[in-house]
Each structure stands twice: as structure tokens, then as C-alpha cells.
Amino acid sequence: MKVSHHLYDQLSRITSEENVMVDELIRNHTYTKLGGKADVYITPESYSEVQDIIKLANKEDVPFTMLGNGSNLIVKDGGIRGIVMNLQKLASIWREEDKIIAQSGARIIDASRTALAESLAGLEFACGIPGSVGGALYMNAGAYGGEIKDVLESTIVVTKEGDIRTLTAVELDLDYRTSNIPDKGYIVLEATFALKKANSSDIKEVMDDLTYKRESKQPLEYPSCGSVFKRPPGYFAGKLIQDSELQGTQIGGAEVSKKHAGFIVNKNNASATEYINLIRHVQKTVSEKFGVQLEREVRIIGEDPVE
């Protein structure tokens, strides 16, 4: 899609011109370092700007995609048509009573660290999750026995019509690595986490232990999308992949990690196509060997490259 001067001018009036980028490479904004170009990449600085961008996209019938920190996401090599919005400039975190409130663009790691600084327990599990707060709600992110569902009290969202609503955690239908946010078309603006007062040294001890486990077991030296597959009932995805002798398997620059079989790393300037093909190869091999269908935890969006 060629971006018209009219659309560019309209978006530049909503936010500053420096926040509107045409033909922006999405790989520069994802943890996997994969993905083609966004027709328009925009980073609003207020909730009202978010509303106005959505309303403009609806009025002009322009496709619209929300992008978080890109930590659990693969964007195809053909990129994304229309408007891609990132809330990285809405990243404030603060305390109110025994609650931590964080804007969507803040990293969930930083929300966890703020809770530690305020001697509030409950977000320790998130100390190693690299995604944004909005992305964490989108997929009910979790690790080491904890998940967003355990601590989320409420959230402020923008609807696909551009209206602001406050929702309780129950209204998001949070479940294992899922929510109703994508189906409803909500855009998360901020989240309120209900925590408990605790001794900061005890909180730090838990976080240090989880950080050690993460750093010792995960291939953090290479770009990746984190855990690729959901945990199948009765199994562990990483163990199935390991027992299928897939560790070290490569397609192009993508490789099944030798350190943690549940990770696929971008070891040598992989394309999104190579990365996705390796995911499919792993799924096919595990299915044939064990009869287990591995379901992706990572989202894949965008268009295939033009041949």
C-alpha cells in the first residue's frame, strides 16, 4: 500500500511528524530481528492520540495493526500493510496504595522492578519477561508458576471504534497464554496490578533466583521470540523437541537452540520465512514421532514476500 500525502498529513496532525515513519523496517522493533516494512509506523504520545489514530484508520478504511515490544511475535518478510502503531512512548509506571499501575508501552520487567522498589510482592514471575505491559495482557504472559491473571485487577483499553473503557481482569477472559483482547480488538492503554506488601529483600531473593534460572537455561545471546510453543497437556514442548533430536537443526539462519530446545534463535541473519519454516518442521517432526501437535505460543502476522 502506497501511503498517500493525505494520510501522512492527517497522522502528522494527530501526533508530531517525527512520530510518523513511512516504510519502516519492523525487524528494527522486534526481538527476533525479523520482518519486512510497515507502510506507516506511528508512536503516539497520549491516549487521545491513540483514539484519534484509530478513528482516522476507520474513517479512511486503512488496515490497522498494534505492535508491542515484539518479543513474542514474528512479522513476515512481506511486512504489514496500513498503519502499525507502537505505544513505546506511553511507558510510565507508578504506585497507588498497594497497586502498581503501568502504561501499555512499559516493559513488564520494569513493572516488576518498580514493585520490588516499592516492597510490593506478586510480580516477581515477570522479572525476566521481555515484553510490554500491553503484550503481557494480550497473551496472559507468565513464567515460573505465575501469570498476569494472578495479579491483574483492571485495565484501561481503547475499543476498535476508538472509545476508552475500563475493564476488570475477569472481563478479559484470561487463560493459559490467551485473552479476548485480540478478538475484541482492544488496545491496552494501562494496567493496574493488585499486589501485597512484603519485605523487599525477600522479593529480591525470589527475583534473583528466577533471573539465574532464566540466564542459565535460555539462549539469551541470540535474538529469539522466547518460548515458541505452548505447553501441551501432559508434556513439555522442549522435552519433546529434544527427544526428537532437533536441537541444532537449522534452516537458513534460524536454529533450534542447543541450549534450550523450546527456543528457536536467529543465529545468522535469518529471514522470517526461514524462521517460520523451521517452526513448521519442528511441529511436523514432533507430530510424526510422538503424535503430539505443538501449538504456537508466538504470533505470526504480516504478509508473505512477493516472489
From Swiss-Prot:
Pathway(s) annotated for this protein in UniProt: Cell wall biogenesis; peptidoglycan biosynthesis
Catalysis performed (reactions): UDP-N-acetyl-alpha-D-muramate + NADP(+) = UDP-N-acetyl-3-O-(1-carboxyvinyl)-alpha-D-glucosamine + NADPH + H(+)
Main location: cytoplasm
Cofactors (names): FAD
Pfam families linked to this entry: FAD_binding_4, MurB_C
Active site feature: 177, 227, 297
The enzyme's E.C. designation: 1.3.1.98
FAD-binding PCMH-type domain mapped to chain residues: 34-198
Keyword Cytoplasm: yes
One cellular component (GO) term of this entry: cytosol
Keywords attached to this entry: Cell cycle, Cell division, Cell shape, Cell wall biogenesis/degradation, Cytoplasm, FAD, Flavoprotein, NADP, Oxidoreductase, Peptidoglycan synthesis
Location within or outside the cell: Cytoplasm
One BP annotation, GO: peptidoglycan biosynthetic process
Family label: Belongs to the MurB family.
Record-given protein name: UDP-N-acetylenolpyruvoylglucosamine reductase
Originating organism: Oceanobacillus iheyensis (strain DSM 14371 / CIP 107618 / JCM 11309 / KCTC 3954 / HTE831)
Lineage: Bacteria, Bacillati, Bacillota, Bacilli, Bacillales
Gene this chain is encoded by: murB
